[in-house]
Amino acid sequence: MKQVVIIGGGLAGCASAEAFSRRGWQVQVLEARDRLGGAVAGLPLIAQHPGLTPDFDLRSRLLVQAMQLHGRLRAGPAADLVPAFEVCGRLQPMDRARAERCVAPVDRAVARVAESPQGNWGVWFPDCAAVSPRRWWQAVLQRPGVSVRMGITVGRVDAAATGWRVVDDQGNSVADADVVVLACREQALALAGMQEADHGRLRLSAAQVWLARADGGPPDEDPGHPVLLPMTSGRGLVLTRPGSFWLRSEEVHAHWLQAGEADSDEDPDVRAFLERPESWQPSAIGERLQLRDNLPMIGPAPDLAAIAAQADDLARNDRLPMPMPLREGLYLLTGMAGRGALYAAIGAEMIAARACGEPDVVDARLAAAVSPARFIKRRLQRAWSGRGKDGP
């Protein structure tokens, strides 16, 4: 049985463990902290965040494909994940004219123009789900061959005779595997040996939500399946389980309290409860990692030594581009930028399919757009162009 080590216990690690375990691999997850969930560990619920632009850009395409792919998996080979995903739809607010342009490239079953009960227009995604990270992990941990080790801080990943060796920060060997997935946010880039010139400038942004429980339960406890309300104000996320649970992003919370606006027709007593600032409790603050092109990194780590040796050829051969040297078997899945529920799902499937020699999950253009080597290629081309201007 083939073995994979996944470094990081967040959404990317969870999705990767699921994808490989579904294919019959032995899966070991290494997490530095004492709990699973990564940046969303303190949240009972998160939401899938697809989005469309009028030009149907690469990001839009990737998010829509991720939503469709994971829906098909939950309807088939990954049916055990269904309790963690409640399909309830989502509204991406925008004016009607822009919404009409955005939905033009996609099937009506994927997205359509819609008006909320409050009279706000936008793009409606009927298959969007609210997600329980805890339940997602619980389902994956029940799979045969999946194990987790907490409190393991990885210091490096070395190539071995038959795969890869994972070494902790004290120099101790902790695992050997055929494949290693680096799913540990910015640490993934460091473990791949990449520096800013290789991955571009990184942006870490803080994210906080506010929680309220009318039934007296702890605010960070998953209360069950939620309802993902249409987002009408354009100012963030609204998740609710009527009568017991509410979760709002900080900006929605502030806007709602100041303007006295509600996103649903709750009864007066519930609305009065939610309008009291003391009813809300701030959650833990998580950080989102965003790359400069706002796309994730998904795929094999670049072979930096081989790239340096072939730099001139890689930079100048544009008409018949040479493939970038890669470290097959060492994969990155990071840079989710607040879209982890979708990027993690499609990224894990792309990586597992590649490791197993299966057909590509996405087309070549999308795969290149999220390749961990993409910034290196651009850097080499810029350097070559500058050399031509300055002379030999």
Regions found by a protein language model. Name each.
Residues 124-163, 168-169, 175, 183, ...:
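Helical element adjacent to the flavin cofactor pocket in flavoenzyme catalytic cores
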Residues 33:
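Residues in the short beta-alpha loop(s) of Rossmann-like NAD(P)-binding domains
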Residues 15-23, 37-47, 52, 81-85, ...:
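Active-site substrate-recognition segment that forms the wall
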Residues 279-392:
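C-terminal catalytic lobe of FAD-dependent flavoproteins
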Residues 59-66, 98, 121-139, 259-262, ...:
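Short beta-strand to alpha-helix junction loop
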Residues 2-28:
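N-terminal Rossmann-like FAD-binding beta1-loop-alpha1 element of flavoenzymes
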Residues 45-125:
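Dinucleotide-binding Rossmann-like beta1-alpha1 core, especially the glycine-rich loop
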Residues 7, 30, 175-187, 348:
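Short hydrophobic core segments
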